[in-house]
Amino acid sequence: MKLNFISKSWRRSLKYLLPILFLIPLFAVLLAGRSPWAIAQSPRQEIRGVWLTINDIDVLKDRAKVRDAVSQLARLNFNTIYPVVWNSGYVIYPSAVAQRMGIQPFVYHGRQGQDLLADLIIEAHRQGLLVIPWFEFGFMTPPTSELALNHPNWITQRRDGSQTWNSAAGEVVSLNPFLPEVQQFITDLVLEIVSQYDVDGIQFDDHMSLPRELGYDRYTIDLYVRETKKNPHPDSQNPEWVRWRANKITAFMERLNKAVKANKPHAIFSVAPASYDFAYKAHLQDWRAWVQKNIVDELIVQIYLSDLQSFLEKINRPEIQEAQQKIPTGVGILTGLRNKPIPMQQVQSQVLAARDRGLGVCFFFYESLWDYAPEPIAERQARFQSLFPIPARRFASHGFAIE
C-alpha cells in the first residue's frame, strides 16, 4: 500500500512555493550585480562584429565621429566592436605599463582630450554594443620600435641568426613567447586593460603566435635541451620541434586566460586566428587545442578569400564545427582595404554562407564597411541592413543584453 505523507493543503502550498524557490538564486545573482545569463555564453549567441583598426584612428579620436559610428552600427544591428589597443609596439590608451617600460614616448588622446578607449566603451554600452579590445600585434613589433630597441634580448631569431620578417604590416620582429619577461610584459598590458576599463573581454588574433622558422635564440635552445635532452631540429618544420613550441604557447595562453578571469571572471577571452592548418603548421598556434582546453570563450576565424568556393571549404572545416558546439564562433570577412575595395555582392554571399551554417561574422575593417567601397554609402548600408534585419541578442559581462 502506498503511503501519502503529504497532505493536500501542503501540496497546494508547494505548487506556489516551487517557482519562488527557483527564482531565489536568480535574484541573488541579480542583487550581486551580475546577470545569471552572462556567466556562460551560449554557442548560439550570434557575433555581428567589426574591427576598428589603427586606420580608423581619425574616427576614434573624434567624439562626434565615435558617436555617429556607434549609432550607425547599432542601427544596422551589429552587436560587438573590437577596437585595436596594441599595434606596432604601442598602445592606444594611457598606459602605466608602457610608461614604466619606457617603450612609448607619447600618449594617444582624442581631439577633445578624451581617453579613446574609455570614450568608445561609454558610447557603445549606451547604445547596447559590446566592446572587446583587440590586442592586434600579439608578440609582433617593428624592429625600429622602442620596445625592440630597448629590449634586444627579448627578440627571437632564425637558425641563421636573422630576426626580421615581412608581415602585412611591413617589416617586423617577434618577441620571444617562451621568455618569462615577455610573457609578464604581455600579461601586464592585458590586465591593465581588463582591470582599468569596463570592457566586455579581450581579443587576440593570428599574431599571438610565432612563425615556425623562429625560436632558435639561446634561451629557447637551452630550454628545449633541458626539457628534452636534445638540440632543436635544424628543420623548423620538424613535427616534434613544432609541437613543443606550440605547446609552450598554449600553456602561456592558458595562464593568461586564468589571469584575465581572476581580474574579471565574466570577461570574454576571444581569439581571431587564421585557418587552423596554416595557424598551427606555419605559426605554431594550436587554437584547436585552446578551444578543447576551454581557454577560449569566443572564436572568429579570419577567412579573407574572394573565391566563394574556397571560402566555403574553409568554413566547413571540422575544427570550426567542433568549436561551434562549445562557444560562439564566427568568420572574419574582409570588407575592403584602402587600396582594394570589395564589392558588396562578395561580402553578402560570404555572410549568407556563414550564417546559413550558424556562424557569426566580424568585418575587417570599420571604414571599409562603406567608406572605401565600390557602391554609394547609402546603398552599401542598406544592403548591410538587409543582412541583419533584426537585432541579435548578445550578453555582456555587466549584465545588459542586446534585444
Please annotate each region the language model reported.
Residues 93-105, 139-166, 206-233:
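Aromatic- and acidic-residue-enriched segments that line the glycan-binding/catalytic groove
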Residues 45-48, 57-60, 138-192, 196:
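Active-site-adjacent "subsite" loops/lids of carbohydrate-active enzymes
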Residues 297-311, 318, 327-403:
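Substrate-binding cleft of secreted/luminal carbohydrate-active enzymes
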Residues 52-60, 99-113, 169-184, 238-248, ...:
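The substrate-binding groove and active-site-proximal loops of carbohydrate-active enzymes
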Residues 78-112:
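Aromatic-lined carbohydrate-binding/catalytic grooves of carbohydrate-active enzymes
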Residues 65-91, 197, 296:
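Catalytic domains of carbohydrate-active enzymes, especially glycoside hydrolases
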Residues 227-340:
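Glycoside hydrolase catalytic-domain groove-lining segments
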Residues 78-85, 116-165, 203-206:
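Glycine-rich, aromatic-flanked loop segments that form ligand/cofactor-binding clefts
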